[in-house]
Structure formats: structure tokens, C-alpha cells
Amino acid sequence: MNWTADFPILAADENGNRLVYLDSAATTQHPMQVLNAVVDYYTKENANPHRGVYELAMRATDAHEGARHTVAQFFNAEDDEIVFTQNTTESLNLVAYSYGMNFLHEGDEIVISVAEHHSNMVPWQRVAKATGAKLVYMYPGENGRLTTEELDKKITPKTKVVAVAMVSNVLGLRAPVEEIVKRAHAVGAVVVLDCAQSAPHTPVDVKKLDVDFAACSAHKLYAPMGVGALYARAGLLEKMPPFMSGGDMIGAVHESGATWADGPRKFEAGTRNVGGEVGFAAAIDYMKGIGWETMETHEHALLDRMLAGMRAMPWLTVYGEPVAEGRYGVVSFNVNDVHPHDVATILDAGGVAVRAGHHCAQPLMEFLGIGSCCRASVAIYNTPEDVDALLENLENVRKVMGL
């Protein structure tokens, strides 16, 4: 099937060419089903949730809590285990500051991968500096994947937190989450899972994975920017202090102090982005209508086609094992001896949109021995013709650069 027609922006031309959007790892486009849901909310239900007793405000509250229920089902979690945030970055910071700053101490160890996005690295660097805990890095093997030997070496009885991306935003490879959780829980550590790049492409069942925290962004799931979700195991949420203070997160306030609201509302200070939350829920419904098996099969075929074409280009380097198996959404590469920005600019002239840069993963770039790279990322709306357009325009890069 072809879902491109659901996404109006993809009907646009770029530089006189059909738009080939291959930057969905940065943000996805929106189907009309999501856009219509957001418009319906703002034209029929817009009010401040949890504030008013009038009918419109009650409908806004229902929309807000209904979206929470949909997100909870998406993660196979309970409603009171889902905190709405702005994005994955805020979700991970919430865990670092509310859990890490309060429950880690000198001599404890925080284990992360060198491949982490800065949002799952810098907060833990700050926690380590503030608490005296030690930050321990895991390094991938030659194929870009974490090995069980590395897990056994780095996860020890001193480990209190293991924070990893389920899928790398650069390499696109799935981490051995099940093996990580088994080892972390065996020593009493909690597992924090960055699902920004996995949630759009493969199920994140928090009960099956048995993780303690999981974070994602709506805008990488065909929904609006400005909304994210944090799953937190209920027992952990109860003992964590609030990350921010203000309206709607309190139980009561007196001159002498304050008490906090129960459940996730303790972490939801201020007016929420309900329109975005409604869009988030609509996007999940859209994905559910397609089905995981259909989505994974479609995207796997696109990656397989892309990597097969790139393997036939000896003047191009792919990062991470250049196979589609165990890879989700992302292929990062460089045209040898050509700056990634030049590659992306030439591709853009042909209507092909990819990202070039360090992808908020500078330590991984250093580990790979490069300063930056290009990244092509696929979504449900991409087609085999999109992949062919990328490959054809990469051939044009070779010709233009005289390779």
C-alpha cells in the first residue's frame, strides 16, 4: 500500500522536484487524520483542563485524559504511569533530576552507551557531577552493536541506573534491551529507555521489556511538536519529587508549604498542550489502523533496498552493520572525502531531504572517527521510489564531486 496521499505536505515540490522526505528521525510529517483531530479540538473542545466545571472545560479535561489513556495503551502501561511532557528530552531530564539527583550517591555508577543522544547523556553527566556518582560508558563492537561481553563488563553491583536508547538515532540499530534489563535488575539498578527512535517503528511494550522508565516524542510519531510522554513504573513515580512546580501539580498550598497531586499530575505543572496531546492520540490511532506488522515489513523493505544500493557504492561508507536486520528507520553514511553538508546540499537540489551533522551524538562521532555524517531516515509514507531517488542523487553527488 501507499500512505503518501495521507500526508499533504508530501504533495509539495522542492527545487522543482518531487519532495522526497528522508528526515523522519528528526521529525515526521502529519497525516490529515492527525491534522483534522487537532483542528476539531481547537474548534470544538478548547479550554483549560482540570480548571473549570463548565461543560467545555470538562470536554477539554476528557480530551487530555483520553489522550493519556491512548498513550498508556500504546506502551501497554497504566494511565497513572504516563506523564505528559514536551518531548523525549524533557522526559529524560525529568528522570535524571527527579530520580537521579535524589537517589544516587557518591560511589554509585550510571551506565550509558557512548552512542546516546545528548539528551540521554548530558543530564546524566550533570547528575554524576552533582552527586559524586560515576558515569560509565559502554562501547559498541565493530558492527555497531553492544555485545553481551560489554554489558557484563560495565554493569556491576555498583550500577544504580542504566540509560540507553532502544534504537540509536545515528546507527539505527536496536540495543539488546532484554539482556540489559536482565543484568541491570539483577544488581538492583533501574533501566531508563530512550524510545524516541524505536517508538515510531516497533512496539515498545514496557511490561514485556520490564523497563522502569521509557520516553518518547509525539513529533517523531506523526503528531505535533511540543508533546512527549514518559512512562514510569508506578512505584517509582510515587517516591520521586516533582521536577517543576506550579499550577495543577499541587494537592494544597499554604504559607507554610505545599503538598503534591497524586500520580502523574505531580509532574505536569502548568497548562498542558492538550491540542498536541489530542494529535498524539490521533497519530497512535493512525498507526494502529495500519498495524505494526505492516509498518515493520514496509519500512524493512525500504531499508533493505537502500542498503543494497549503498553497498554497491564503494565510494560511500555506511555506519553500523550495513544490513536491514535489527535496524529501524535510520541509515547514516558519508560519501568519502566529501563534507556531509555538501552531500546534503546536492541531494536537496534534487528534492531529497536528509540531515547532515553530528545528530546530537558528538561522542559517537568521535568514537567513529568522524566529525559528522549524513542520515537518511524512513517512515510509513516513504516509497521504493523515494529510496531510488536518494540512490540516483547520490550518484549525482559522485559525478559533481568528481569521484
Tell where the protein language model's regions lie, with residue ranges.
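Pyridoxal 5′-phosphate
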Residues: M1-L403
